[in-house]
Amino acid sequence: IHTTAQMQVVLVKPDRFDNVSDIAEHLRSKHAVVLNLEATNKDVARRLVDFLSGCAYALDGKIKKIAISTYIITPYNVDIVGDLIDELENSGLYL
């Protein structure tokens, strides 16, 4: 019997820090999370990124800034690859 686990990507656009526990739960469930902070207050956005960076670290995951105010947080079993990611890392513009 062949079974394939389906990876899920969750898109979130939090407006307050209270949303962080739901986002952390997605990470604990091994879902990748795209975090859009465009409409989030700067102080709240910083707290969210700090907390979720800690969650990613504790779960052996990764967090990468992929655009202005947008991050991707992945579980340990997901690699982030691609020309855009390499370009962003090499230029130092976003990471």
PLM regions and their residue ranges:
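Short, glycine-/small-residue-enriched flexible loop/hinge segments at domain edges that mediate gating
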Residues: V33-N41
